[in-house]
UniProtKB/Swiss-Prot annotation:
This is Chitinase-like protein Idgf5. Glycans are attached at N289, N311. It comes from Drosophila melanogaster (Fruit fly). Residues 29-444 form the GH18 domain. Glycosylated. Disulfide bonds join C33-C60, C349-C429. The keyword Secreted applies. GO terms for cellular component: extracellular region.
Length: 444
């Protein structure tokens, strides 16, 4: 290395480059694992104990505990299940796992559409009110610091409950494109003060980041599906004040939003004659276009471990090829999730393995995606009485790995995995625990 001694400037330049390369490289290939704490108190096969959670932690860089909420009067962070988090000390039981898994950072997430009003609907109003007043933000910030320190969390994740875009009817591609463009310039349909809230959210992050940095704690943001980044997120300011952002690149179509049309819930690329924004690539590209190449490693792509399911009717046809017309809302709940229109990976795997002669649960026909661009689905056409029809679009280990490969190819930070409790955490399908999580990790 005599040339370094002769030219110290080049040596300094090389050291700077290596430091940049190492810091950037260290930030890619991350796996953010979301943990629905309600899985701990569910009954039956959906219940996931801490012992069943632990095998996943060897693959996770971050564990995000979901979810806390906000008090509508004091604007302080609050538990959404005090009997679990306080009486049973569940927060501390989770963060105590750090002793066995020191490589994992434990975050507490706020919002996530779990903070609901008296009607059981995600409450966005108080999240906007908190942003609007400086004293409300200060109350929230102080309570966050106390909650993290009291329970041993390494940081806070803001899955902020902004108003969601309204569902759009299926229509031709020209109308889809025009509707999307028109939506960029009009915010009155979901929030007349979106510009103010956009700036106020950036201010909240700047203030909160300043407090958290003193204690070496993390600040992250999780975008929820159907929340418009164009309306509510100042991308450069947000990325400059957070450690990373988990993109809501899933649930583009759901039975709740689109009860009459079944379609692939999470295509990787744009599909013909669909909303051009309803795919992973579009969402990622929007964020990449708004920031510098240096900050791209802060973006994590959301990947799920479940499927969205609709009832097929006689008028839905027999081919199963999406989009499926004349669907009849959410399919019946599974034995594990017990939620209409939502099936976990082990529930889907079980349905796929049923034999045709099984009268209780007739088998589904799986249709793959040789293009590796849009996703897979399985279906059962309605019978002569118009009953027992089912259509489900979902992720499996292979499609999740394809998305992880996309993340790697784009130079993004990693994957945000939703949710550990929906993966096959008992290995009941193929004998391997957390197969989707594993497939993502190995591809990253």
């Amino acid at each position: 290395m005599m040339w370094i001694q002769k030219n110290p400037f080049l040596g300094l330049l090389l050291c700077s480059f290596l430091a940049f390369f190492q810091s950037t490289y260290a930030e890619v290939g991350k796996l953010v694992c979301f943990y629905d704490a309600q899985s701990f108190v569910r009954e039956g096969p959906a219940q996931m104990s801490l012992a069943e959670l632990e095998p996943a932690l060897q693959f996770c860089n971050f564990l995000v505990y979901g979810y806390a909420g906000i008090d509508a009067v004091t604007y302080k962070i609050k538990s959404l299940d005090p009997s679990l988090t306080n009486d049973r000390q569940h927060y501390r039981h989770i963060t105590a796992l750090r002793k066995k898994y020191p490589h994992v950072r434990f975050l507490l997430s706020v919002g996530g559409d779990r903070d609901v009003n008296s009607e059981g609907v995600a409450d966005s109003d108080k999240y906007l009110r908190l942003l609007e007043q400086s004293e409300h933000r200060k109350s929230f910030q102080a309570s966050v610091l106390a909650e993290l320190n009291n329970n041993g969390f390494d940081g806070i994740d803001l899955a902020w409950q902004f108003p969601k875009n309204r569902p759009k009817l299926q229509q031709g591609v020209f109308k889809r494109v025009w509707g999307s463009l028109r939506g960029w310039f009009s915010s009155s349909s979901v929030d007349e003060k979106s510009e103010e809230h956009r700036e106020q959210f950036a201010t909240l992050l700047e203030e909160l980041q300043s407090d958290l940095r003193r204690g070496g704690q993390l600040l992250t943001v999780s975008m929820l599906p159907h929340v418009s980044a164009e309306l509510f997120i100042d991308v450069p300011k947000v990325l400059s004040n957070v450690d990373f952002v988990n993109l809501g690149t899933y649930d583009f179509q759901t039975p709740e939003r689109d009860p009459k049309v079944a379609d692939l819930p999470t295509p990787l690329y744009a599909m013909y004659d669909r909303d051009p924004s309803h795919n992973v690539q579009y969402q990622v590209q929007y964020w990449m276009n708004q920031t510098s190449e240096i900050s791209v490693h802060k973006l994590h792509v959301g990947v799920t471990s479940y499927g969205r399911a609709w009832n097929m009717t006689r008028n839905s046809g027999i081919t199963g090829y999406p989009p499926i017309p004349a669907a009849n809302g959410a399919a019946p709940p599974g034995r594990q999730t017990v939620t209409p229109g939502l099936l976990s990976w082990p529930e889907i795997c079980d349905l796929l393995q049923q034999q045709p002669q099984d009268r209780e649960v007739p088998h589904l026909r799986k249709v793959g995606d040789p293009t590796k661009r849009f996703g897979i689905y399985a279906y059962r056409a309605a019978d002569d009485q118009g009953e027992n029809g089912l259509w489900v679009g979902y992720e499996d280990p292979l499609t999740a790995a394809i998305k992880a490969g996309f993340v790697h190819a784009q130079g993004l930070g990693g994957v945000a995995f939703h949710d550990l409790s929906m993966d096959d955490f008992r290995g009941q399908c193929a004998g391997e625990k957390f197969p989707i999580l594993r497939s993502i990790k190995f591809k990253l």
